[in-house]
């Protein structure tokens, strides 16, 4: 025997244990048959433990009586509102989905517990706390995903879900018990009463509307974000020169053909596709270095209709033992190439006419390495002697008068040697560096080589002067020694 509970969270199928709890199964079946549970709220949700239902009004209503059994409902006798519950020793709360009647102790006999219409469904395993407090009469066999939804519901501090979860309808799949006297099954599910409607917090429909509205708002926000991102990327490509303008769209009369055989040529494709209309261009893209086919091509038709007809009829057609794929072109590289070539040609023509700052554009200026005032060259590029002739002579020639330079006097009538010696070496070096900076790199390299060669020559001259001076000193020493020896020889003769 089974019962189907249609809830706002989904459907749950319960198998009844009529052999272990016949009276409780009969009470539950007959209450489902008279639609007593319709619109009953699910409340007291304890995560991973249990939830409770079966009261048509629920604990939030002040008019609720906690529910009653089928016999009390039919007779109206308060004494039959509840009945003694039977606890079978073999039935324990060990598995998730165990269904049991909620009970309360008898006012006069605490060992006897009374059941009415409310029942409990466990949401976790090993909920043995309920043993002896709730009488088991069934188990859930289908709808465990619904139990997960109920377990994850948002609840307040008393365990009541913020969004109503209610039993919408009950369907009896098998009923072995005869109907009690006076019971009549309604022909249709009755609408909820005013007392039941007063207990509504947030209906499922309102939640769905809110969820759908939030989903639509999120989708709209995502669409706008993608549009802004695409516009920004297009603007970036336009600034980089890869697109003629940001709003450029791929042409509608160009087909993209791929998966070609490497031996297929432009003429072959043009001949095959020309039956759909006039072809303006047909190009198989090839490698720039090797010239080999990259096995895809672009075909440009004169009108859009011919392009669409070729697309609908030539996809997956066999050409040169290869089944090709045809699609509309999404490339704008050809438009960009045409735009770039036209722009460059306009700039070149404007530059030839002398218009614009540079390249035909007023805002551009040709880059210059040096300023105009820095390229003034000296008229006299000849080198001048730094040392006088007397500086190149030996130390023993210092008593001779200085030799004047035969060239025109630069220092205002003074000796050239004196004028050069009065100038500091650092000043000469700074002037040399300034002169080298104003000249080109090749002249600087040549002058550097000349200076190195001159430095080596002067080093050799100094070495020779040093050896020459040493020879003079040795010669003077030998002459003095010879005179002393001759003097001693004369003394001995006397």
From Swiss-Prot:
Residues 391-418, 425-494 have a biased composition (Basic and acidic residues). Keywords: Coiled coil, Isomerase, Nucleus, RNA-binding, Rotamase. The keyword Transferase does not apply. Its EC number is 5.2.1.8. It catalyses: [protein]-peptidylproline (omega=180) = [protein]-peptidylproline (omega=0). CDD domains: cyclophilin_RRM (cd01921), RRM_PPIL4 (cd12235). One of its GO terms (molecular function) is RNA binding. InterPro entries: CRIP (IPR035542), Cyclophilin-like_dom_sf (IPR029000), Cyclophilin-type_PPIase_dom (IPR002130), Cyclophilin_PPIL4 (IPR035538), Nucleotide-bd_a/b_plait_sf (IPR012677), RBD_domain_sf (IPR035979), RRM_dom (IPR000504). Residues 1-172 form the PPIase cyclophilin-type domain. GO terms for cellular component: nucleus. It holds the Pfam family Pro_isomerase. Belongs to the cyclophilin-type PPIase family. PPIL4 subfamily. PANTHER family: PEPTIDYL-PROLYL CIS-TRANS ISOMERASE-LIKE 4. This is Peptidyl-prolyl cis-trans isomerase-like 4. It comes from Neurospora crassa (strain ATCC 24698 / 74-OR23-1A / CBS 708.71 / DSM 1257 / FGSC 987). The lineage of its organism: Eukaryota, Fungi, Dikarya, Ascomycota, Pezizomycotina. The gene is cyp-6.
């Amino acid at each position: 025997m089974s019962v189907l509970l249609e809830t706002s969270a989904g459907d749950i199928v319960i198998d009844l244990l009529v052999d272990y709890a016949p009276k409780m199964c009969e009470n539950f079946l007959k209450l489902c048959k008279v639609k007593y549970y319709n619109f009953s709220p699910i409340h007291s949700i304890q995560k991973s433990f249990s939830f409770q239902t079966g009261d048509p009004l629920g604990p939030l209503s002040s008019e609720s009586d906690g529910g009653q059994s089928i016999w009390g409902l039919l007779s109206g006798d308060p004494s039959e509102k509840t009945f003694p519950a039977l606890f079978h020793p073999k039935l324990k709360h060990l598995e998730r989905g165990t269904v049991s009647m909620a009970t309360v102790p008898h006012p006069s006999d605490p060992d006897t517990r009374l059941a009415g219409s409310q029942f409990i469904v466990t949401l976790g395993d090993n909920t043995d706390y309920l043993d002896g407090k709730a009488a088991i009469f069934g188990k859930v066999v289908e709808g465990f995903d619904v139990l997960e939804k109920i377990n994850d519901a948002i609840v307040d501090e008393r365990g009541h879900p913020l969004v109503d979860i209610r039993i919408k309808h009950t369907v009896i799949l098998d009923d072995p018990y005869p109907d009690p006297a006076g019971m009549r099954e309604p022909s249709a599910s009755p609408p909820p009463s005013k007392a039941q409607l007063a207990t509504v917090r947030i209906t499922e429909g309102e939640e769905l509307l809110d969820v759908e509205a939030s989903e639509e708002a999120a989708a709209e926000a995502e669409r706008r974000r993608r549009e802004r991102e695409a516009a920004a990327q297009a603007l970036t490509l336009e600034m980089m020169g890869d697109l003629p303008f940001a709003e450029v769209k791929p042409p509608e009369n160009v087909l993209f053909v791929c998966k070609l055989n490497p031996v297929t040529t432009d003429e072959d494709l043009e001949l095959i596709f020309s039956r759909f209309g006039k072809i303006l261009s047909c190009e198989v893209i090839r490698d720039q270095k090797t010239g080999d086919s990259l096995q895809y091509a672009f075909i440009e038709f004169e009108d859009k209709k011919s392009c669409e007809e070729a697309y609908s009829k030539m996809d997956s057609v066999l050409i040169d033992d290869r089944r090709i794929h045809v699609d509309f072109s999404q490339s704008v590289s050809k438009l960009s190439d045409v735009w770039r070539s036209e722009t460059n040609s306009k700039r070149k023509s404007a530059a030839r006419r002398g218009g614009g700052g540079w390249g035909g554009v007023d805002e551009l200026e040709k880059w210059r390495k040096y300023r105009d005032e820095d390229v003034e060259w000296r008229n006299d590029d000849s080198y001048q002697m730094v040392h006088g002739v007397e500086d190149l002579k030996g130390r023993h020639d210092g008593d001779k008068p200085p030799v004047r330079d035969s060239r025109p006097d630069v220092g205002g009538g003074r000796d050239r040697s004196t004028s050069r010696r009065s100038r500091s070496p650092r000043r000469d070096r700074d002037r040399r560096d300034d002169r080298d900076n104003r000249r080109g790199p090749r002249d600087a390299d040549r002058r550097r080589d000349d200076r190195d060669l001159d430095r080596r020559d002067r080093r050799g001259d100094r070495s020779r002067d040093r050896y020459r001076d040493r020879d003079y000193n040795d010669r003077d020493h030998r002459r003095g020694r010879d005179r002393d020896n001759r003097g001693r020889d004369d003394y001995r003769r006397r």
